[in-house]
């Protein structure tokens, strides 16, 4: 079919009566894209040329004849050159998928025409099935789905693009959903074109662990999270639930303090982890149980350390799950009790515990004095 379409396009040009050497040789693209329509498309100015080129790219069309009978013959070349430059520079799909656009002037049906050829560096499927995100919120959702699937990349057309710190976005999502993001990948980011409110966003993820292994780890970690939900009694108070989840997490193993690239899996399935893994998993387990727990980043005795701040009965407290490595039990601590810990106080709630009741005001003695006694 591709070869037939190419021959039809060449035939349109040859029937004009010009010599064969006056026209571009039309060869089907090896990537499998469509070769186009032999019917010439009439263009009369720059805007129409630009629209025709963008339509070719959007449809993954390789060859198309443009009829330029209504244009000044002396302006055709300059106008088409400008339209090609603009298309490649500003159109998201062209910037993403086009390797080269070439053309040859001639005639079609005894009228001036241009045979345009486009060479692509993406497959027809990649072009025609490009996902779309209306804004950065939808883009973030697509990125999260890709992370959940341990995919190696995600690409989409973003209609309203805003510059974003994607490394931080991925780290935040991984911290909130450690049962899904087993390993935080390194990220390579590209936008097509490089600048603009509407562009194609491509993120490539690199993992040290194979996708098959990551999916297996996901399944095992999610089973542990399911067990944690069952461990919490529905009629318990929030204080009891915090304590139950603390015990569930810290008493699973005789833990060994080490850092792992598959933090949640190593901690929950092999008893190997650091303070960050403890705090992240505890916060996520609390969230699945309807409890509020933040992950705090700071230092403990001068070393990098992570712990949690929980909200219990309307009051905030510090809880350090990794203290179990030193034999610690569940304790709700106020700020003044965090000896050896340092954190950015402006970033987290103040942990003062319940307010002390105000002392009762002294009542004035209204009993009569001895002088007034009768």
Kindly label every feature range from the protein language model.
Residues 19-234, 344-374:
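N-terminal accessory/pre-domain segments preceding catalytic cores
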Residues 266-276:
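Periplasmic OmpA-like peptidoglycan-binding domain that tethers envelope proteins to the cell wall
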């Amino acid at each position: 079919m591709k070869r037939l379409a190419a021959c039809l396009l060449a035939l349109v040009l040859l029937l004009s009566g010009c010599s064969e050497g006056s026209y571009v040789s039309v060869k089907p693209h090896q990537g499998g894209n469509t070769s186009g329509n032999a019917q010439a498309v009439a263009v009369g100015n720059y805007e129409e040329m630009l629209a025709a080129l963008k339509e070719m790219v959007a449809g993954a069309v390789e060859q198309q004849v443009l009829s330029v009978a209504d244009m000044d013959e002396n302006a055709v070349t300059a106008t088409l050159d400008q339209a090609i430059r603009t298309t490649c520079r500003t159109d998201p799909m062209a910037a993403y998928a086009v390797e080269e656009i070439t053309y040859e002037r001639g005639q079609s049906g005894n009228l001036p025409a241009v045979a345009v050829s486009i060479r692509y560096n993406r497959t027809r499927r990649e072009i025609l099935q490009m996902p779309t995100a209306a804004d950065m919120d939808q883009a973030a959702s697509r990125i999260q789905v890709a992370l959940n699937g341990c995919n190696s990349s995600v690409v989409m057309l973003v209609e309203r693009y805003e510059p974003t710190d994607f490394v931080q976005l991925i780290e935040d999502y991984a911290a909130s959903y450690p049962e899904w993001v087993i390993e935080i990948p390194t990220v390579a980011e590209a936008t097509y074109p490089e600048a603009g409110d509407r562009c194609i966003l491509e993120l490539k993820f690199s993992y040290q662990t194979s996708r098959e292994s990551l999916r297996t780890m996901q399944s095992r970690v999610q089973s542990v999270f399911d067990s944690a939900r069952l461990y919490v009694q529905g009629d318990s108070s929030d204080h009891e639930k915090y304590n139950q989840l603390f015990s569930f997490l810290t008493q699973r193993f005789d833990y060994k303090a080490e850092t792992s690239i598959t933090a949640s899996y190593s901690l929950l399935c092999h008893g190997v982890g650091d303070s960050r893994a403890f705090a992240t998993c505890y916060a996520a387990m609390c969230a699945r149980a309807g409890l509020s727990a933040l992950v705090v980043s700071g230092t403990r005795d001068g070393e990098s350390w992570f712990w949690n701040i929980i909200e219990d009965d309307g009051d905030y407290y510090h809880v350090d799950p990794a203290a179990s490595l030193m034999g610690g039990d569940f304790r709700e601590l106020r700020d003044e009790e965090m000896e050896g810990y340092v954190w950015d106080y402006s970033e987290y709630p103040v942990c003062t515990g319940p307010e002390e009741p105000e002392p009762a005001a002294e009542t004035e003695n209204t009993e009569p004095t001895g002088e007034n006694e009768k």
